[in-house]
């Protein structure tokens, strides 16, 4: 299961991660976010040895959402060594998400 990110743990879990991070920013009321959940979980099972999968609920962590400039959900942030190296917004199929992971973190 993806790590739930909060204001309290973002530095330790995301910024200091030894693995590249795929951070899914979502909301419980967001339909496309809910559609992506099984895809994100499936990829986490397949790729967890290479990437850290994390998620941020915009309603639970508003400060962090503002810090990252989140204006819509779902948004995926690709983070390497504490720096955002890519950002994608909107629903993505599994194949598209794999392509984006390879593009930004591969």
Where are these regions (language model features)?
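Proteins that catalyze or organize thiol-disulfide redox chemistry
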Residues: 1-52, 60-63, 67, 73-75, ...
């Amino acid at each position: 299961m993806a790590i739930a990110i909060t204001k309290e743990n973002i530095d330790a879990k995301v910024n200091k991660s030894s693995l590249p991070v795929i951070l899914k920013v979502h909301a419980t009321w967001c339909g496309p976010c809910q559609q992506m959940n099984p895809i994100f979980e499936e990829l986490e099972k397949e790729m967890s040895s290479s990437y850290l999968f994390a998620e941020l609920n915009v309603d639970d962590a508003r400060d962090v959402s503002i810090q990252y400039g989140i204006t819509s959900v779902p948004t995926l942030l690709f983070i390497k060594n504490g720096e955002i190296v890519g950002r994608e917004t909107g629903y993505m199929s599994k194949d598209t998400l794999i392509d984006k992971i390879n593009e930004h973190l591969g």
